[in-house]
Amino acid sequence: SPTGFMHLGNLYGALVDERLAHQSKGVFYLRIEDTDRKREVEGGVQMIIDAFKSFGLPFDEGATTDGETGIYGPYRQSQRAEIYQTFVKSLVQRGMAYPCFCTEEELSAAHEQQEKNKENFGYYGKYAVWRDRPMEDIEAELAKGTPYVVRFRSEGSIEHKIRHEDLVKGKMEVTENDQDVVILKSDGIPTYHFAHVVDDHLMGTTVVVRGEEWLATLPVHLQLFRAMGWKAPKYAHTAQLMKIDPETGGKRKLSKRKDPELALTFYAQEGYPVPAVLEYLMTLLNSNFE
C-alpha cells in the first residue's frame, strides 16, 4: 500500500515472499493496493520500489515507477475497477451480493444497539436490513440517486468452524464468517477483501504471506473464494515483530511513535549493513534457516 512509510514489518513479509518465490522457481511480483485513497501519499510507489531495491529484493514483475512489467496487469488496483465491478455484478446476478443503502447514521445506531445488547458488532442477521428488501425498494433508491455499497450475502454462522491448515501456524479451526461484508464501496472501488480475492486468482498467486493480524479476515476470504468457484491460495500468517519495552519490561509491538528502528531508513542512517538486517530477519523467521 503506497502510504508513504516503509517499515521493518514490510521488509519482513516481503523477504518471505521473495525467498519462497525464488526457491520454488516462482515469481515475486509487486501489486499496488491503492484502494484506500485517503491514505495514499504522492510518490508512495517509488518509496516501495526504492526501499526493497536497497535491501536486494528486486521484483520479477509488477508495478514500476513509470508503468509496469508483466502479463497479469494492471498491477495497480485503482486501475482494475472494471474488472472488480464485473465480478461483483456476477455475484449480484447469482443472488450472492446486494446493494445496501444504509447511511452512516443508521449503521452507527445499529452499532450502539449491538453494544447495548452485548451482541457482536457488524452487519448480519436482523441488522442486515437491506439483505432481503424487495426490488421495488431498491429501484426507488436507485431512481433517487441514493449512494450505496454492495455487500456479500454470507451464508456462514458463528456456530460453525472451518478447518484450515496455515503454512506457518499449522492445522487450525476458525469461526465461519456471518457478516455481510462490503465488497464494493460507493465510489465503485472494491474493499481489500474482494480485491485480494480477485487479484490473487487472476494473477495466479499460490502463496499469500501476511501478518497474523490478518488472520481474523481469513474466513471472509475463504468464503469469497468458494463463492467465486476459485481455488484459494495457501496462506502463511507470520508472527508480528515485537520488542521488550524498556519501561515496562513486557513485550509489545513496534511503534512508529516510539521506535525509530521500525523505519527502514533507520538502518542506513545508523550504518547497519544490508546483509546483517536480512540475516536478522531470516533468523527471526526461522532460527535454522541456513
Positions of the model-derived regions?
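Active-site cores that bind ATP or allylic diphosphates and position pyrophosphate for catalysis
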Residues: S90, Y98-H237, M242-L254, A263-L264
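N-terminal Rossmann-like or analogous alpha/beta NTP/dinucleotide-binding catalytic cores
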Residues: S1-E119, A216-W230, A276
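A conserved active-site cap/scaffold subdomain adjacent to cofactor or substrate pockets
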Residues: E261-E290
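Glycine- and acidic
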Residues: S1-T3, Y29-D34, L202-V208, E261-A263
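Hydrophobic alpha-helical scaffolding
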Residues: K38, P74-Q77, R210-G211, F266-G271
